[in-house]
Amino acid sequence: MANADLDLYARPQKRIRINRRRWINLLDLGEGGPTVVLCGGDRSTTLIWARVQSELARDFRVVAYDRAGLGFSDPGAFPRTTRRIVGDLRAALRAAGIEPPYVLVGASNGGFETRWFARHHPDEVTGMVLVDTTADDWTLRQQAAAPSWRPAWRNYLNQLRYVADCARSGSLRPGLAEYAQYVPQPMAQLPEALNDRRRDEALTPGYWRTHISECEAIEAASAAGGVDTRALLGDLPLVVLSAGVRIAPPLPNDEVRAFLATLEAGQEALVALSTLGVRHCIADSGHNIQIDRPEAVIAAVTEVVAMTGTRAS
């Protein structure tokens, strides 16, 4: 896709009114069913799918959107729980006249969104792709494997609150250590307009408030785990994509090994959510597979659509 075409992700696409006060930004491309719905991870907007959506749209109708408080969507009610996020998405799809069934694609924490959607609205979902996401009980897993992880996580959230304060005061600028650490740096795979948009959005306090709330909500939900999730999605066609290149948080060396082993176990747990679950490790990709290896995500969606013909009636 030419950079001129990718630049459309740097501006509002189609703002959909979901109630009397709020609008959700949505990008709808292509034709053909089932409709593919793309759900990004932390701080992600439609532009994280810029290298995937147009290619998928050659064969399917493909929808990407900005969650409330991010991109060109209006803020939503707090806290930003997965339930509220899915409610916004379903309202936007209905208001835009985009009917199910859907193949849901969730990247990173967007996987919590897609799984919640499928569990509570199974008749609307015909397949799922999870792109380097984590298990529902990841908080419990990491706490058990790496005791230093929880204090490191709390410190991370406190740092984000400070960054939000800097954004509010206008001091989040080049030269500040937190600017270099937390404001998205340019991605070589994206054109200048998209990298500029990613940077500019991160200078707004609402961006950080939304991100912090989403992190806290997912942490709280995953800490309440303990539910046997095996085959929880039944025979839903499911492909799990796992990054082959991992970066661990700052932990003691012995805990880093345990942390990474727990991530690996979590990937296998995701596969077990469906009796039709399969997994592919993308050896040369980091966490953002949709940016590093977009063809892997495209192939996974095609695989899931092919699997839909194997479901029990």
Language model segments and positions:
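Conserved HGGG/HGGXW glycine-rich cap/lid loop of the alpha/beta-hydrolase fold
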Residues: 22-72, 107
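Conserved catalytic-core motifs of eukaryotic protein kinase domains, centered on the activation segment
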Residues: 48-50, 73-79, 140-141
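N-terminal cap/lid segment of alpha/beta-hydrolase-fold proteins
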Residues: 3-23
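Active-site loop/oxyanion-hole signature of alpha/beta-hydrolase fold enzymes
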Residues: 27, 64-105, 109, 121, ...
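Alpha/beta-hydrolase
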Residues: 38-40, 65-67, 131, 242, ...
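Conserved hydrolase catalytic core segment
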Residues: 100-143
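Catalytic active-site module of serine/aspartate enzymes centered on a nucleophile-bearing elbow/loop
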Residues: 274-313
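Flexible "cap/lid" subdomain of the alpha/beta-hydrolase fold that forms the substrate-access gate
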Residues: 129-269
